Amino acid sequence: EFSNATGLTTVALSDTTIDATTLAATINSIDVINGLNTTLMTLAAGATINIDASEIATILGHETGSIAGGSRLTISDQNIVVTGNISVDDANLLSATTTGTVTASITTTESITELKTLTETSNAYTIVISSADATATAEDLSAIDGKTTATIDATAVTSISGTYDEVTALYESTGVDNLGDEAISISDELTV
C-alpha cells in the first residue's frame, strides 16, 4: 500500500517459505526507500519462516518494535523453523508470537527445571536431557514430554523416581526415548 503523504505503509509478502535473513534485508531496503516512515510487512498466512538461532532477537525486534523504526513485521500464524540450538526463553518468545508451530532444538544444557517452563504444547522441540539431570523424576520427564510433539532423548538419565503410576506412564509413553536401563525408585507402597 502506498500513500503520497506517508510513502509505503504496508507490504504483503505472499511467499509460503520465508528466509529470515532475506526478510531482514528487505525490511532494511524498504526503510531506505521509505525514509523515516514505518512500513508494516505482513506475511502469508501459514507461511514458514526459516530462521537461524542468531537472528531471533532481530526478527522479534522487528515484530515487537523494540528495534528503531517501530513494529515493522506481523508474525501471527506462521510456522517458524530454527536452525541451531535455542534457549527455553527464546523458544517461549517465538511461541508467544505465533499460533503456528515452532520447530527447534533446545540447548542441551537446559535443566529439567527450565525445560518445564516451556509454555506451549504443540511445538516440535528436539530436547535432550542433560547429564546434569541424570537423576530425574517420572513426573518431571512426563511434564516435559507434554511440552513437545517431538521425542525427548533421555539417554543421560540413569535414575528415575516416582509413584508406580507415574513411572508406568513414563515408560509407556512414546514421547520419551532411550529409557530402559535406569535405576527405578517407586515412592508408593505396592501390593502383590
Give the ranges of each region predicted by the language model:
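Solvent-exposed, low-complexity segments and loops of surface/extracellular structural proteins
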Residues: 1-192
